[in-house]
Amino acid sequence: MSSFVSKGITRRNVLKTSATAALFGAVNSAFPAGVFAETSGPETPKATLGFIALTDSAPLIVAREKGFFAKYGMTDVAVQKQASWGATRDNIELGSAGGGIDGAHILTPMPYLISTGKVTKGNVPVPMYILSRLNVNGQCISVAAAYKGMGVTTNATALKDAFAKAKAEGKEVKCAVTFPGGTHDLWMRYWLAANGIDPNKDVSTIVVPPPQMVANMKVNTMEAFCVGEPWNAQLVRQGIGFTAFTTGELWADHPEKAFAMRADWVDANPKAAKAMLMAVQEAAQWCDKMENKEEMCAIIGGRDYFKVPVEDILGRSKGEIDYGDGRSVTDSPFIMKYWANHASYPYPSHDLWFLTENIRWGYQPADLDLKATIAKVNREDLWRDAAKTLGVTDLPAGTSRGVETFFDGKTFDPENPAAYLASLAIKAA
């Protein structure tokens, strides 16, 4: 056990460390380096960002608590907890000028759903930019304890039979996700459909905010849910259910959350946006280092953020997974990554997959101009510019990661999304 753990991972200890970092960050911001060395600095030092209590929000929280925002001149960045993804959307629509937020830790498909007006009030488009990916991997599909012992993993054959039996007996079978068309919804739908379970006909897909998943499973509200950490680990620790699989087992190193902002804010404050992007990139590098995991978990687990025991976050953040059904691993290859292997780079080819799946399930129209839509929302060019200014030399060679392979053998070729869509047996009518 490390000395950090033996002394107690307390919010007070972490705040002392963070306060020191913030102090040095503030000093550094008085003499900003790199991009701001010969300029007047960011147009504004202020921005308001939102986050949901999920481990993959860590880069935004750490950027604030460890002084990375301040280091690049963004000395007044608020990182505010949102009650749900719906609340995140509502506050992005408002913008900080209207009492909302300028940007957020967000499910990657949401900036597209918001920019196209599919989920906004009156279907009015609110243009957004994806500035960075926040992580790959790290989500799970967990199942109620009643189904333990059936061998449910990515293979859900037994679950298909159990669900069919329950439905025949008049029971409503519910699977919970966090936002329609979001990543958790798409992982759940992909898994069910790959196992012959139609998510639109054979089960009821319900929306539950991430922090409420465990409480709802406890009172038998649903059979399964898809969400990020720490809620799957908490479910297992409380003995309420088990993790069927981590989403990296569904698609290795899959893209997950994004750091996105209102386009009008970025357009009005390009230097401030770059400063924040650099801070988030530096925070992602910090979060990815194993020696920082304990402090990272202590920071995000504190009462200003998640309000959960560090133990609910730490294990899986280090690749230690107790699935809750007898399986366990201590060095999972599907650990959440924030920076390694270009995890932070927002590959447009990945956004193309999300849009294709949103078309599959009816969240986006079949005639959507995919190339034009991605060009408007995905600002990988800004990511590259910020990374180069930071001195990053290992940049992605292109804007596509190439052909992606899923657990069921299906492949997605970004050069031919129509062929992928045609290969899928179950989809919205």
PLM regions and their residue ranges:
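N-terminal secretory signal peptides
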Residues: 1-13, 27
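Sec-dependent signal peptide hydrophobic core
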Residues: 18-26
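Boundary at the C-terminal end of the N-terminal hydrophobic targeting segment
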Residues: 32-37
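Short, glycine-/small- and polar/acidic-enriched structural segments
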Residues: 38-200, 204-207, 219, 223-233, ...
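Ligand-binding pocket segment of bilobal, Venus flytrap-like solute-binding proteins
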Residues: 102-103, 201-243, 262, 294, ...
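Short glycine- and hydrophobic/aromatic-rich loop-to-beta-strand nucleating segment
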Residues: 141-142, 258-261, 265-266
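Secondary-structure end/capping motifs
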Residues: 268-381
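Conserved C-terminal helix/tail region of periplasmic/extracytoplasmic solute-binding proteins
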Residues: 352-429
